[in-house]
C-alpha cells in the first residue's frame, strides 16, 4: 500500500506531518504529506507503491510523538455508493490476508464523530464480507494484523491495515479511562494514561508497585499524587499550594510547602519522580536533568508545555539536549520516550528511565 494514515489530536496536524516526514526520510521512504488543520489526521503518500507497507512495519508507533495510531492505507475511497459501500472497501483490502480484527473508525473531531453510529452499524456487514473474501479470519486473533477502515466524511474512507505488535490497542488510538470520583483534578488522567503508555502491562507489577517512594513536583491539588497513592506508593508532594485533604488523610503523602525547583529530597531511595508544572519546557527539562545527574530517581514522568509555534522543533531540541547532557554526565544507559497523550492538551508527556538494565536498590 502506498499511504500511511496517522491519527492525531485536532490542531496538531502540522506537528504530526513534520514528524512523519523526518522519520520516513530516516528510513529512506520518500513521499509527501496531505494534511488540513483540525482534521485530526495526516496522510503520508509515498513515492513507492509499497511505501506504506514499509513504514507500518519498520517505524515503531511508540517512537512517534504526535501520532496516536497509524495504518498502511490504500488511496482514498471517495464517493462510495450508498447502495454498496462494502464492495469497493473489500476490493481495496484484497491484498490483506487473514487479519484478526476489524476497526471501522473516524478521526477524533466533532464532525467525524457524527458518523460513529453509521460506523457501528456498517461494521457488521463489512465484517461478514471480509470474512468471505479471506481478508478477515472467522474469529478474532490478537496476533494477526488489524484491518482499519477510517471514514473521514460521508462516503469517504481510507482502508488498510496495521500490525498488532506495532499498533495502539485502542479504537482510534484513544484509551478509555474513567475519571475517579475522588480524584482531585482531571489532570490525574494524564498520569494514569502515561503509566499505561510507557510501562508495559506485564512490567507494571515490578515497576509501578506498592511500597515505592515517589516525589511529585508541583503537586497541588494532587491529581498526579492521587495516581501514585492509588498504586500504594509513599509520596513526597512538593508545592506551595494546598493539597487535597482526602489524599493527606491516607497517610501516604507528606506535603512539602516548597518551590519544586529548589526542593531536595531528604531520602535518596526514590523510584518515581513525576512533574506537571506550568513552566517553560526547557526549565522543566533542566530540572529533570539535575535530578538524574544527582541519582535521585530511577524513572520519571514529566510534562513539557508546548509553545504556540514550532512545537515539534522545540520538543525535539529539548529531547536531544537532554540526551547529550545525560551522556556528558556519565549516564550512558537510559530510555527516553515522549508522547502527545490523549489527555494532554498543549503539552507532551515524557518518560525517562535511568539504567534500565540495573536493578533498583
UniProtKB/Swiss-Prot annotation:
The keyword Transcription is assigned to this record: no
Active site: 305 (proton acceptor)
Subunit and partners: Monomer.
UniProt function note: Catalyzes the 2'-O-methylation at nucleotide C2498 in 23S rRNA.
Gene name as annotated: rlmM
SUPFAM superfamilies on file: S-adenosyl-L-methionine-dependent methyltransferases
Catalytic activity: cytidine(2498) in 23S rRNA + S-adenosyl-L-methionine = 2'-O-methylcytidine(2498) in 23S rRNA + S-adenosyl-L-homocysteine + H(+)
One of the record's GO molecular function terms: S-adenosylmethionine-dependent methyltransferase activity
Protein name as it appears in the record: Ribosomal RNA large subunit methyltransferase M
Amino acid at each position: 500500500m502506498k499511504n500511511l494514515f496517522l491519527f492525531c489530536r485536532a490542531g496538531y496536524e502540522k506537528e504530526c506531518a513534520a514528524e512523519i516526514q523526518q522519520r520516513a526520510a530516516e528510513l529512506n521512504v520518500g513521499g509527501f504529506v496531505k494534511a488540513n488543520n483540525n482534521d485530526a489526521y495526516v496522510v503520508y503518500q509515498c513515492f513507492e507503491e509499497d511505501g506504506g507497507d514499509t513504514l507500518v512495519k519498520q517505524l515503531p508507533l511508540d517512537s512517534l510523538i504526535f501520532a496516536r495510531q497509524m495504518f498502511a492505507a490504500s488511496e482514498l475511497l471517495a464517493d462510495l455508493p450508498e447502495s454498496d459501500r462494502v464492495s469497493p472497501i473489500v476490493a481495496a483490502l484484497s491484498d490483506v490476508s487473514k487479519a484478526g480484527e476489524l476497526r471501522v473508525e473516524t478521526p477524533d473531531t466533532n464532525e467525524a464523530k457524527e458518523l460513529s453510529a453509521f460506523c457501528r452499524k456498517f461494521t457488521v456487514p463489512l465484517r461478514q464480507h471480509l470474512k468471505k473474501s479471506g481478508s478477515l479470519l472467522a474469529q478474532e486473533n490478537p496476533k494477526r494484523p488489524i484491518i482499519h477502515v477510517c471514514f473521514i466524511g460521508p462516503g469517504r474512507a481510507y482502508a488498510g491495515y496495521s500490525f498488532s505488535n506495532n499498533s495502539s490497542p485502542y479504537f482510534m488510538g484513544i484509551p478509555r479511562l474513567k475519571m475517579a470520583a475522588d480524584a482531585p483534578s482531571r489532570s490525574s488522567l494524564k498520569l494514569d494514561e502515561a503509566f499505561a503508555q510507557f510501562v508495559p502491562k506485564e512490567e507494571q507489577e515490578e515497576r509501578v508497585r506498592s511500597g515505592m517512594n515517589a516525589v511529585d513536583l508541583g503537586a497541588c491539588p494532587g491529581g498526579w499524587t492521587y495516581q501514585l497513592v492509588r498504586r500504594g506508593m509513599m509520596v513526597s508532594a512538593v508545592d506551595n499550594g494546598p493539597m487535597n485533604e482526602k489524599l493527606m488523610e491516607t497517610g501516604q503523602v507528606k506535603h512539602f510547602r516548597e518551590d519544586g525547583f529548589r526542593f531536595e529530597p531528604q531520602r535518596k531511595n526514590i523510584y518515581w519522580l513525576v512533574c506537571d508544572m506550568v513552566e517553560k519546557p526547557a526549565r522543566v527539562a533542566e530540572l529533570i536533568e539535575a535530578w538524574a545527574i544527582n541519582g535521585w530517581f530511577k524513572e520519571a514522568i514529566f510534562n513539557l508545555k508546548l509553545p504556540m509555534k514550532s512545537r515539534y522543533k522545540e520538543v525535539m531540541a529539548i529531547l536531544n539536549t537532554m540526551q547529550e547532557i545525560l551522556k556528558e554526565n556519565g549516564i550512558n544507559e537510559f530510555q527516553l520516550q515522549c508522547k502527545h497523550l490523549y489527555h494532554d492538551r498543549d503539552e507532551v508527556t515524557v518518560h525517562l528511565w535511568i539504567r534500565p538494565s540495573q536493578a533498583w536498590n
